[in-house]
């Protein structure tokens, strides 16, 4: 009987990386900063947790340079829960990503929520065995990240605001650009590839599939069960929730309600019941009130 290396099965080839990402479909991934929060997320039904130093709302409020979480905290979170643990690295900071991979995280988020480390390049994700998720506002950004090796895409939205409008905008933008590819000739697709600065092979594949070649989650401003259901109705494969859980009045109730909302996103009667008694959501800030130079979604290229 051949011995199976389960670490190699979990990580490694592009097929395996994308397979792991697809396993999270239909689920909720929650930002956590402590093992206690990770336990709450798991008990609420999250399919995975995202370990970071502070939730986006606090990162935005504190200012300064936002970096990878303390490896000791990441390790404690890994040891606390049985669901997959993801963690954020700065854009272009391949050493942070290497450290997270060495810690044994299940996925790395090359995230615009943290302060970008490289003004020229994103991480070459093909050089890693751990899968990556990256943010995107449009089809060009999404396909460039996939070309670099991303196994999952998420909308950027505007993290830490509690305002879902930018996540809606980015989801509709990507889907609209994909629909516009339908029926185009090879020559026309080549022109599109040039315009959006993406590889023609990925443009052709996307046109044929009429969706991104990898799973596409919603993120950035999801703060209520209704927000989560809205993003699923718009075609998201799943939902990331950052500040919306642990900045809510009752994090435990909000976490469970968001998971239930994603599971019942197309049933308004159930959504009404789910939304009762969860307490107030995070206070938040309108994304329109944020100056362009302070918008996290503008990070990355």
Swiss-Prot record:
Entry's EC annotation: 4.3.3.6
Residues annotated to bind D-ribose 5-phosphate: 31, 160, 221, 242-243
One MF annotation (Gene Ontology) recorded for this entry: amine-lyase activity
Binding-site residues for D-glyceraldehyde 3-phosphate, renumbered to this chain: 172
Reactions mediated catalytically: aldehydo-D-ribose 5-phosphate + D-glyceraldehyde 3-phosphate + L-glutamine = pyridoxal 5'-phosphate + L-glutamate + phosphate + 3 H2O + H(+)
Annotated Pfam families: SOR_SNZ
The entry's keywords: Lyase, Pyridoxal phosphate, Schiff base
GO BP, one annotated term: pyridoxal phosphate biosynthetic process
Residue positions of the active site: 88 (schiff-base intermediate with d-ribose 5-phosphate)
Functional note: Catalyzes the formation of pyridoxal 5'-phosphate from ribose 5-phosphate (RBP), glyceraldehyde 3-phosphate (G3P) and ammonia. The ammonia is provided by the PdxT subunit. Can also use ribulose 5-phosphate and dihydroxyacetone phosphate as substrates, resulting from enzyme-catalyzed isomerization of RBP and G3P, respectively.
PANTHER family per record: PYRIDOXAL 5'-PHOSPHATE SYNTHASE SUBUNIT SNZ1-RELATED
Homology family: Belongs to the PdxS/SNZ family.
Quaternary structure annotation from Swiss-Prot or TrEMBL: In the presence of PdxT, forms a dodecamer of heterodimers.
Name of the featured protein: Pyridoxal 5'-phosphate synthase subunit PdxS
UniProt organism field: Methanosarcina acetivorans (strain ATCC 35395 / DSM 2834 / JCM 12185 / C2A)
